[in-house]
Structures are given as structure tokens and as C-alpha cells.
Amino acid sequence: MITIHLRYEIDPAKVADFEHYGKLWIELVNRAGGTHHGYFLPSEGDSDEGFALFSFESFAAYEEYRKWVFTDPDCLAASKFAADTQCIRRWERRFLSPVFS
């Protein structure tokens, strides 16, 4: 299993837009065979930082998802929403191996 950790720098005035974006991607990742662990919005502390975690069975499955993202109309629409609203300033991606016990 591989877990992807995304750290977003977001516009603090557009947290509601970022939340909407996150809800779109939760459904899309799950539809693509991944397991989305949620988006995490700012509460206390930094107001311009958000996170997401999702997993795929393997890195190969994640690579298939990445190919799908660039062709699926709903994925393209979700990306366009973020670009149009400018709720995301930048993002970073990390690949992690989870330990459960």
C-alpha cells in the first residue's frame, strides 16, 4: 500500500472553495479505486494550510490513477474549479508507507 500526503497552501479567504474542491476529489479518488482518508481544513493555527491523505493498493495503481486524472471529465472539472477560484496557491506531494500495527 502507498499513501499520498498532500500539503496545500491555500487562500485563507477561500477555505469554503477549498472544502468544495476537497469533496470533489474524495469521490473521484474513491471512484478510481483508491481510499480517500479525507481533507483537513485549517482550524486553529496556520490559516493558509490544508492537507489530504489517500491510499492506493500499490504505486502501479496510483500511476494508473494519475493517467486517468488527465482524461476524466470530472477530474478535469475539479482541477478547473481550483484554477478558476484560485483557492490553492501551491501544493506538495509525498509518498508514504503506512504502519498500522
Could you say what each language-model-derived stretch is?
Residues R7-P12, F54-S58:
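Short beta-strand-to-loop capping motifs
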Residues M1-I2, S101:
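Absolute protein N-terminus
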Residues G45-D48:
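Short acidic/glycine-enriched loop/turn segments that link adjacent beta-strands
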Residues H20-H37, S55-E92:
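An amphipathic, aromatic/His-enriched active-site/gating alpha helix that lines ligand/cofactor pockets
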Residues I2-R7, F18, V29, G50-L53:
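Short, structured motif recognition centered on aromatic/hydrophobic residues
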Residues Y39-L41:
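Short beta-strand/turn micro-motifs at beta-sheet edges
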Residues S43, I88-S101:
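Long, low-complexity, Ser/Thr/Gly/Pro-rich intrinsically disordered segments that act as flexible linkers
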